[in-house]
Amino acid sequence: MSLLTEVETYVLSIVPSGPLKAEIAQRLEDVFAGKNTDLEALMEWLKTRPILSPLTKGILGFVFTLTVPSERGLQRRRFVQNALNGNGDPNNMDRAVKLYRKLKREITFHGAKEIALSYSAGALASCMGLIYNRMGAVTTESAFGLICATCEQIADSQHKSHRQMVTTTNPLIRHENRMVLASTTAKAMEQMAGSSEQAAEAMEVASQARQMVQAMRAIGTHPSSSAGLKNDLLENLQAYQKRMGVQMQRFK
């Protein structure tokens, strides 16, 4: 796996699923391929994206700044600086300075990542802030190692939280989660159907599913009534894809 592929993988692991994630993935691919060279426009685009947390925006802004060539005097962006200040905690800043000194001596991506993984996410963000604000300089490989370690820590905590929700025995949470997943799947079906002639059937199925979820929420239903809703939708989607000659067995 190439270095940039690894960076893209880690960064995308902390971006919530949805159309925006696909858009960000495309931007990262373009940047890493040297196709997008307007850093100012890229940062303005990133700043106005909805849904993303300030920290995720800060990390993406740091990645873009490291990768896209720019004039030396280009202004640093406030939304990135604020996200990478370690919540203003002086302890985070102290640890960030210690980490920075170690990273300065490290020239490899994997070496930097190993060192960074022993620090908290707050200290890692502060260290990125030091480098972003030009208070310190490390090799690009070391900076990428720092970014990937930060993403790994964030993804770990997101995974724990997700696992807790998936394994919860609370029937109300399970019911709502099934309906949210069904609604999201229906939305994906509508987007994939596009404008082809055979799309009408898929659009109809998706539309009915979304109406059903809305009705269930409006009138209130028994927590078990949503069981199988998402799987039924996915079966419909896969049947539609088969007829279209598309095989996507990994949807589930």
UniProtKB/Swiss-Prot annotation:
A motif (Nuclear localization signal) lies at residues 101-105. Residues 165-252 are annotated as: RNP-binding. It is a peripheral membrane protein. Disulfide bonds: none annotated. GO terms for cellular component: host cell nucleus; membrane; virion membrane. One of its GO terms (molecular function) is RNA binding. The keyword Cell membrane does not apply. It comes from the Viruses. Pfam families: Flu_M1, Flu_M1_C. The keyword RNA-binding applies. Keywords: Host nucleus, Membrane, RNA-binding, Viral matrix protein, Virion. Residues 1-164 are annotated as: Membrane-binding. Most abundant protein in virion. When expressed alone can form virus-like particles in transfected cells. Homodimer and homomultimer. Interacts with NEP. Binds ribonucleocapsid by both interacting with genomic RNA and NP protein. May interact with HA and NA. Cannot bind NP without genomic RNA. Belongs to the influenza viruses Matrix protein M1 family. Plays critical roles in virus replication, from virus entry and uncoating to assembly and budding of the virus particle. M1 binding to ribonucleocapsids (RNPs) in nucleus seems to inhibit viral transcription. Interaction of viral NEP with M1-RNP is thought to promote nuclear export of the complex, which is targeted to the virion assembly site at the apical plasma membrane in polarized epithelial cells. Interactions with NA and HA may bring M1, a non-raft-associated protein, into lipid rafts. Forms a continuous shell on the inner side of the lipid bilayer in virion, where it binds the RNP. This is Matrix protein 1.
